[in-house]
């Protein structure tokens, strides 16, 4: 079986191995495609069934561990959203113009979760599918990199953090320095603002 990175669950090598063992699968190869050719935080691997498997096996984590994990995750997500809202409000208060970068699911859903996403000037996407499109929930216009020539901002918050090196390289062509490009993960952590 070929498995690839899926956005609903963010597996790493360790968690993928543990998860598949519960269903009598063994990892054959994590290096099917060399890391330098994989994009961002993608995880691609191959696994095979063990001999004499019981495919009806449904053992999951004990309920108390599962519910605590999800309760803590929910708490951390809300805390992170509050930190993003503080960041957004603070920058507006001091007159900084901020744009988001990454109109994929992570960027769109995060902005839709914020009560003040309208403080962002727009949302940049390297290759938007068309012009005059807006992110659901936040209503932010999705623009291409060229938009920055006529509409510069002071800071860019990157939601697509797995592509950070590539994004910084692209933004440098438009005059942006590394200190103007922030990862939303860093902002979500406590103590940034």
Roles of regions detected by a PLM:
Residues 44-193:
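Hydrophobic, well-ordered beta-alpha structural blocks that scaffold small-molecule cofactor pockets
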Residues 10, 27-29, 46, 99-100:
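Structured core elements
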């Amino acid at each position: 079986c070929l498995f690839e990175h899926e956005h609903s669950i963010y597996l790493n090598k360790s968690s993928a191995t543990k998860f598949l063992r519960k269903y009598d699968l063994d990892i054959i190869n994590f290096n099917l495609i060399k890391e330098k050719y994989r994009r961002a935080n993608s995880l691609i691997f191959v696994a095979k069934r063990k001999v004499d498997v019981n495919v009806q096996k449904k053992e999951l984590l004990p309920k108390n561990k599962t519910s605590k994990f999800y309760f803590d995750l929910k708490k951390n997500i809300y805390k992170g959203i509050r930190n993003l809202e503080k960041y957004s409000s603070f920058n507006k208060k001091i007159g900084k113009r901020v744009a988001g970068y990454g109109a994929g699911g992570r960027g769109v859903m995060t902005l839709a979760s914020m009560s003040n996403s309208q403080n962002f000037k727009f949302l940049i996407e390297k290759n938007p599918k068309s012009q005059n499109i807006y992110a659901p929930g936040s209503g932010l216009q999705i623009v291409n990199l060229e938009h920055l020539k006529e509409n510069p901002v002071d800071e860019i918050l990157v939601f697509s953090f797995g592509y950070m090196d590539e994004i910084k390289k692209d933004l440098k062509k438009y005059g942006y320095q590394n200190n103007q490009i922030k990862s939303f993960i860093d902002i979500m952590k406590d103590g940034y603002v």
